[in-house]
UniProtKB/Swiss-Prot annotation:
Keywords: Cobalamin biosynthesis, Glutamine amidotransferase. Belongs to the CobB/CobQ family. CobQ subfamily. The gene is cobQ. Pathway: Cofactor biosynthesis; adenosylcobalamin biosynthesis. InterPro entries: Class_I_gatase-like (IPR029062), CobQ/CobB/MinD/ParA_Nub-bd_dom (IPR002586), CobQ_GATase1 (IPR033949), CobQ_N (IPR047045), CobQ_synth (IPR004459), GATase_3 (IPR011698), P-loop_NTPase (IPR027417). This is Cobyric acid synthase. It comes from the Bacteria.
Length: 511
């Protein structure tokens, strides 16, 4: 029979996704067949599986940590906000509809038997499932129809460990408040607490641990030290802490436009890990500076984000940068914005029917109801072999003054030839639908060399850090960190359904 453990958090960005990934790697290293599971994920960071199904990125990196291929069953429901009131609802990788919160709140009850069936299919194939909740289980206005926190735990009778982020402050209030806002049945499901991102001497924390255990009758089974691991971040909250000022000691200054509805910012993880590269996120005109490369990322509402560029003054700044021979790359929605105009006659993305683009590429995009979700391999205009994935609802046509950026050779593992993207005559402006383009080492190394040559400097002096290899190392570091700082014997008992009590054993931080 499958063992299971569910990680819930006191708030968003408490560390649930990373903790699940670490536990998956830990159990995988012990020879267990383990998979992650999150019944419902709200995120603009998504991935396309080998079968062309769309799922949340968090469950992808958790699957990588578990040593298995991403499977849409690990994240059956994906919600992609299109605006402040509506989300695109995706079930098992396929779009169902756009729904507002009230409509979806009523509708999601119909998904419960389907979610249970999906979960059971994973349970039949694995030894352990590590479940992840969303936000906080104490969203008491939503709990009557919850399908992702205590509602999911009840569906499959999973024990829960609550994780709280001490780095933000107020950790004991968040633990106590979360537990006490739950009803009696839900409180009984919480079998342990983990305090995350602790800095300092754990002895100073111990009086608080003793008090919170006494108040809640729930044992603290781990204190995880703050660790500077280079792992993907899925929650857009994490962007709030990203740099906006360039690093004067870096070889290259790369600026990403931080769109209000930015999607797939995981595209830039490969850039973040490279030595002597300054990666920063531009939110307003004052942050623009003098970058060596400007990247316009994907967007879940391209027309509205184009309007943001106009209103903020960033549109003119990007145009001026390009006119002065600056290098600009647009990914997916960013590619669409580089063109002359975007048309949305059926209001697929926005209430706007048409909007002018940046005018840096001779292209025009029309939005369609049909979403393209594929994994691809191809060859760029300069001969680099690349792979990645596409997620978009627009069709872009090139004019005569542009050339295709990439020749696609295979789609979802099947031979298929077509052209992707566009590149300007002077090669300075590139647009592509390929997410993950920067994860290709040769392409990235050549890009760095080009940017440095434009500055009359020698080529990039470092070997490109391969993202896949780098992540494998980070997953192992994470697993070791968790094993050293969680009372694994207590966690094993929880997973077996055995009762554990508040003990006198004190957690000790191990780096």
């Amino acid at each position: 029979m499958v063992k299971q453990i569910m990680i819930q958090g006191t708030a968003s960005d408490a560390g649930k996704s990373v903790l699940v990934a670490g536990l998956c790697r830990l159990f995988k290293n012990k020879g267990k067949r383990v998979v992650p599971f999150k019944s419902q994920n709200m995120s603009l960071n998504s991935f396309i599986t080998a079968t062309g199904d769309e799922m949340g990125r968090a469950q992808v990196f958790q699957a990588e940590a578990a040593g298995v291929f991403p499977d849409v069953r690990m994240n059956p429901v994906l919600l992609k906000p299109t605006n402040d009131r509506q989300s695109q609802v995706i079930f098992m990788g396929a779009i169902l509809d756009n729904m507002d919160a009230v409509t979806y709140h009523d509708f999601k009850q119909t998904l419960i038997p389907k979610i249970q069936a999906v979960y059971q299919s994973l349970a039949d194939e694995n030894d352990i499932i590590v479940l992840e909740g969303a936000g906080s289980p104490a969203e008491i206005n939503l709990n009557d129809r919850d399908i992702v926190n205590m509602g999911m735990a009840k569906m499959v009778d999973a024990p829960v460990v609550l994780v709280a982020d001490i780095d933000k402050g107020g950790v004991f209030a968040s633990i106590y408040g979360t537990i006490m806002l739950l009803n009696e049945e839900e409180r009984a499901r919480i079998k342990g607490v983990i305090i995350n991102k602790f800095r300092g001497d754990v002895a100073l924390l111990q009086p608080g641990i003793d008090m919170i255990e006494e108040l809640t009758n729930v044992p603290v089974i781990g204190v995880i030290p703050y660790a500077n691991l280079q792992l993907e971040e899925e929650d857009s909250v994490s962007l709030n802490g990203k740099n906006y000022a360039p690093d004067s000691n870096a070889l290259l200054d790369i600026a990403i436009i931080c769109l209000p509805r930015i999607s797939n910012f995981t595209d830039f993880h490969s850039l973040e890990i490279q030595p002597e590269i300054s990666l920063r996120y531009i939110r307003n005109l004052a942050d623009f500076g003098k970058p060596d490369l400007v990247i316009i990322p994907g967007s879940k509402n391209t027309l509205e984000d184009m309007a943001f560029l106009e209103e903020s003054g960033l549109k003119k700044a990007i145009q001026n940068f390009a006119e002065n021979a600056g290098k600009v790359i647009g990914i997916c929605g960013g590619y669409q914005m580089l063109g002359q105009k975007m048309l949305d006659p059926d209001q697929v993305e926005s209430k706007q029917l048409e909007i002018a683009g940046l005018g840096l590429l001779d292209t025009e995009t029309i939005f369609l109801d049909q979403k393209r979700t594929t994994q691809i391999t191809g060859v760029t205009h300069s001969g680099e072999a690349v792979e990645g994935y596409e997620i978009h609802m627009g069709e872009t046509k090139r004019g005569e003054s542009t050339s295709p950026f990439c020749k696609i050779k295979a789609v979802n593992g099947n031979e298929e030839t077509h052209q992707d993207g566009a590149i300007s005559a002077n090669k300075n402006i590139i647009g592509t639908y390929i997410h993950g383009i920067f994860d290709n080492d040769v392409f990235l190394g050549n890009l760095f060399d080009e940017l440095l040559t434009r500055k009359n400097q020698s080529i990039y002096p470092h070997e490109i850090i391969n993202l896949k290899e780098h992540k494998e190392q980070e997953y192992d570091k994470l697993a070791a960190l968790l094993e050293a700082n969680i009372q694994m014997d207590q966690l094993e008992k929880i997973m077996k359904g055995e009762k554990i009590c508040v003990s006198t054993q004190k957690p000790a931080i191990k780096e």
